[in-house]
């Protein structure tokens, strides 16, 4: 078995409007039954994820907060991979009128319409923070922390090579971890720039696309091993 791990994004990949349908859940269970590991790699805060997805136990590990937090569903253990946001930064954002501000243990997120206010606060306070885009959202994390950070930590805990993972995503913030996987997939509703930088694009959107690729994987890994097109952003060996 070459591909022993499936690493998937949540919103826009597994989930449509925040929910995962029954067919997708059943396919994930089939993948687990095949002896493979499941990783969820999401920008969501853990509590937000729990509210919409009670089946966290399907996954061996969950990378939350866009790579800043690693969670073990079986034990409830959480491991922070980044520092919490400075209170001065949060205060400045609130004073600037950045509405819909979401603050996790490490991540800060708001609407993309407030991107300028976020940049201004980072610069004026001289903070070592970065902005990560995710469709209509802006996420703020320490420099060097993204989905690849949590993905690497999760694979290390599983003691499996990164090249043994099939990664599935849909948006800008998924580049970081898909770029490391042995095989990368964009679902049909993914942004165009992501579709140009992966090994496979599904015909189906979100959950239907995930089901499509996992069915192929369970039937045979041969098509995955052979599909190595020219990529605009070459993957690491």
Describe the residue ranges of each PLM region:
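The start of beta-strands in P-loop NTPase/AAA+ ATPase cores
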Residues: 4-6, 60, 165
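Asp-based phosphoryl-transfer active-site loop
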Residues: 2-18, 178
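Active-site phosphate-binding/coordination module
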Residues: 17-103
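Asp-based, Mg2+/Mn2+-dependent phosphohydrolase catalytic module
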Residues: 180, 185-237
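Conserved acidic, metal-coordinating active-site core of Asp-based
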Residues: 87-181, 185, 189-197, 223
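Short, well-ordered beta-strand core segments
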Residues: 6, 31, 62, 184-186, ...
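Short, hinge-like loop/turn segments at secondary-structure boundaries
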Residues: 56-59, 79-82, 148-149, 202-205, ...
């Amino acid at each position: 078995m070459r591909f022993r791990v499936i690493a998937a994004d949540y919103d826009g990949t597994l989930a449509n409007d925040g929910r995962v349908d029954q067919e997708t859940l059943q396919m994930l269970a089939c993948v687990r039954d095949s002896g493979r590991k499941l990783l969820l790699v999401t920008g969501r805060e853990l509590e937000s994820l729990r509210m919409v997805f009670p089946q966290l136990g399907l996954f061996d590990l969950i990378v939350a907060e866009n790579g800043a937090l690693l969670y073990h569903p079986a034990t409830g253990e959480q491991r922070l991979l980044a520092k919490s946001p400075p209170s001065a930064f949060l205060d400045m954002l609130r004073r600037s009128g950045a509405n819909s501000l979401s603050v996790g243990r490490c991540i800060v997120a708001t609407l993309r319409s407030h991107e300028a206010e976020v940049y201004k606060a980072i610069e004026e306070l001289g903070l070592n923070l970065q902005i990560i885009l995710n469709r209509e959202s802006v996420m703020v994390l320490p420099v060097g922390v993204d989905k690849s950070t949590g993905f690497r930590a999760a694979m290390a805990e599983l003691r499996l090579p990164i090249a043994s993972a099939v990664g599935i995503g849909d948006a800008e913030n998924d580049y970081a971890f898909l770029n490391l996987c042995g095989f990368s997939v964009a679902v049909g509703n993914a942004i165009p720039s992501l579709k140009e930088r992966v090994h496979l694009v599904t015909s189906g959107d979100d959950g239907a696309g995930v089901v499509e690729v996992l069915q192929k994987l369970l039937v045979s890994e041969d098509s995955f091993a052979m599909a190595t097109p020219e990529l605009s952003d070459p993957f690491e060996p």
